Amino acid sequence: MKYIGAHVSAAGGLANAAIRAAEIDATAFALFTKNQRQWRAAPLTTQTIDEFKAACEKYHYTSAQILPHDSYLINLGHPVAEALEKSRDAFIDEMQRCEQLGLSLLNFHPGSHLMQISEEDCLARIAESINIALDKTEGVTAVIENTAGQGSNLGFKFEHLAAIIAGVEDKSRVGVCIDTCHAFAAGYDLRTPAECEKTFAEFERIVGFKYLRGMHLNDAKSTFGSRVDRHHSLGEGNIGHDAFRWIMQDARFDGIPLILETINPDIWAEEIAWLKAQQTEKAVA
């Protein structure tokens, strides 16, 4: 079964994220559990936790259908010790918030070397950051997102994801989220079913579907291999509809949150309905 949704706003209270997801007939959703552009957040209150859990129960969202995202400020591979410590503390807080909310996944961007350390050193720091956070939490899986490779961001090659996973001690609590726009911008073609097969065969060989814990379904304003992260509405960008139809018809993407971060929230309900409909369309030739 496919879990399909969008990254919805939690403005006015975390419970509102579940309500907004239900309003667009989503069977999955993503959210920030705190302001994603601030380091600090007030601790979750018992009321906030209870209201969130009640809303999820009311609208039938289990933790398997929810993909929280951490703060954009966090860099788990930071080259400077003090800044790395700050990011690690913030990441632990994000993991603990998920734990309190009964959520089992936390999606994050791996990190950046900022042109100050090698890729290898940065990837090792990211893995160690994950190890530290896993040691201090229970029941939450760290879900590494592939990136477009803008600037000095790592995670744009499947090999980067594999290297991070290799450095994580508890393999049962690490996974990946593949963003289609990021993959395309990083040079993984998805424009035809044949290219999708090729790209995900490479993913299986290097990382493995056993680690796939979520997807971000985004078309791309950015061009192929441009290393530029610019999302677009499904079918409106340079990837086109075929990739998303192909994903919907492949059982390897069952049972994980498939999340839209497309640029027009006004048509999310339409995009979700279209994705759902592709599951029963004639298989892509």
Swiss-Prot record:
Highest taxon of source: Bacteria
Cofactor note: Binds 3 Zn(2+) ions.
Pfam families recorded: AP_endonuc_2
Residues noted as binding Zn(2+) 1 in the record, renumbered to the chain: H69, H109, E145
Primary enzyme class: hydrolase
Signal peptide (from-to): none
Positions contributing to Zn(2+) 2 binding: E145, D179, H216, E261
Catalytic activity: Endonucleolytic cleavage to 5'-phosphooligonucleotide end-products
UniProt key word Plastid: no
Binding site for Zn(2+) 3: H182, D229, H231
A GO biological process held by the record: base-excision repair
Cofactor: Zn(2+)
GO molecular function: deoxyribonuclease IV (phage-T4-induced) activity; DNA binding; DNA-(apurinic or apyrimidinic site) endonuclease activity; phosphoric diester hydrolase activity; zinc ion binding
EC identifiers of the protein: 3.1.21.2
Function of the molecule: Endonuclease IV plays a role in DNA repair. It cleaves phosphodiester bonds at apurinic or apyrimidinic (AP) sites, generating a 3'-hydroxyl group and a 5'-terminal sugar phosphate.
Family of this protein: Belongs to the AP endonuclease 2 family.
Protein name per its UniProtKB record: Probable endonuclease 4
Source organism (scientific name): Escherichia fergusonii (strain ATCC 35469 / DSM 13698 / CCUG 18766 / IAM 14443 / JCM 21226 / LMG 7866 / NBRC 102419 / NCTC 12128 / CDC 0568-73)
